[in-house]
Amino acid sequence: EAESFDKKGGWVLDNQSMGQMGSPYLLAHGLGVPVENASTVIQVRKAGKYRVWVRTRDWVKQWNKTGSPGRFEVLFNGKALDATFGTEKASWHWQDGGTIMLKVGDNRLELQDLTGFDGRCDAIFLSSELDLFPPDEGKLLAVFRREMLGLPVEPEDGGEYDLVVIGGGIAGCCAALRAARL
């Protein structure tokens, strides 16, 4: 999941599609100036050839406009993949990034914004099964994500509460303070 990158750089966490996807994504909102790279280090257990899939979307395709203002690249160990992402479909989908050779151990992964105009990256999936195509829609995607992330089928019971405050914005802080005084 892109939101778990160690360093977000100039990319920001956007949660507007949580209902569709079940998680937030990284957004490169630079007002026309490319933002600083997001980066993380991944551990590869077995050296070899991997297919790279990037879950993204071209946010202007829905209006049948030409060009893709939210373009970005994915770099492994400082080298960009041949594909440019955020250029194919209006809906969230897995865009094929081609194949790459990876070494055992630490490998640096980066998102490089090319435009500063809202590139979107939800997740990156690597597979040594070069013909594997990750699911794009609904329940199949939810099951795939849960299995890849090692999450349980049913969430752990967190107990019973009178009030749960989600978010630390002004409204969330006010609600938490008021609840603490009751």
Locate each region found by the language model.
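Beta1/beta-strand and adjacent pyrophosphate-binding region of the FAD-binding site
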Residues: 157-171
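Glycine-rich FAD pyrophosphate-binding loop
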Residues: 180-182
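Extracytoplasmic
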Residues: 1-155
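Generic hydrophobic/aromatic pocket-lining and core-packing "Φ" positions
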Residues: 176-177
